[in-house]
From Swiss-Prot:
Protein name: Chemokine-like factor
Record flagged with keyword Membrane: yes
Source organism of the structure: Rattus norvegicus
Tissue spec. comment: Both isoforms have highest expression levels in testis with relatively lower expression level in liver, spleen, lung, brain and heart and barely detectable levels in skeletal muscle and kidney were barely detected. In most tissues, isoform CKLF2 has higher expression levels than isoform CKLF1.
Residues in MARVEL domain copies: 13-133
InterPro entries according to UniProt: Marvel, MARVEL-CKLF_proteins
Molecular functions (GO terms): chemokine activity
Purpose: May play an important role in inflammation and regeneration of skeletal muscle. Essential for embryonic development.
Origin organism lineage: Eukaryota, Metazoa, Chordata, Craniata, Vertebrata
Keywords: Chemotaxis, Cytokine, Glycoprotein, Membrane, Secreted, Transmembrane, Transmembrane helix
Entry similarity comment: Belongs to the chemokine-like factor family.
Domain of life where this protein originates: Eukaryota
Record-annotated membrane-spanning stretches: 19-39, 45-65, 74-94, 107-127
GO CC aspect terms: extracellular region; extracellular space; membrane
GO biological process: leukocyte chemotaxis; lymphocyte chemotaxis; macrophage chemotaxis; neutrophil chemotaxis; secretion by cell
Length: 151
């Protein structure tokens, strides 16, 4: 008698909530960067937001091409969480710095979009932490005794 095959419930990245949150994060960060560029804000504002846009594009490309499943040497969800924490700190500092002094309206709008980036980044971090907590994979997954016998 044939053994039952495992049903894999695989949803492509483009249709997942993670993709929606990352895309929203990318759009809001790009909007913040555009406002900073148009307002000729201080260079650190533009550089930090540009750096964040580059990292988000890299992560979206990584997940779209399923390279996180191919390159097993890194634990990608943990790197994504660390990136989200660092992005939250940097964008919070940039947004507060843009809103505190009396600046132009465009810089203030860029700061507001920076705060929206922080909110999207926290949501992305919470989503990744939930994935780490409830669905571990790879060498970090707890294996049962029956899984060890099958190997």
């Amino acid at each position: 008698m044939d053994s039952p095959q495992k049903v894999v419930d695989h949803q492509p990245f483009c249709l997942s909530l993670k993709c929606f949150v990352k895309t929203l994060r990318l759009v809001v960060t790009v909007a913040s960067m555009i406002f900073f560029i148009v307002a000729q804000a201080p260079e650190p504002y533009i550089v930090i937001t540009g750096f964040e846009v580059t990292i988000i594009l890299f992560l979206i490309a990584l997940y779209m091409c399923s390279l996180d499943k191919t390159m097993r040497s890194f634990f990608w969800p943990l790197l994504d969480v660390i990136n989200s924490v660092v992005t939250t700190l940097f964008m919070l500092i940039v947004s507060v710095s843009a809103l505190i002094p009396e600046t132009s309206t465009m810089i203030m709008v860029g700061g507001v979009f920076g705060f929206l980036t922080v909110i999207c980044t926290v949501a992305d971090c919470a989503l990744m932490c939930q994935k780490l907590r409830f669905r571990p994979h790879g060498p970090y997954q707890n294996r049962s005794a029956t899984d060890v016998d099958d190997s």
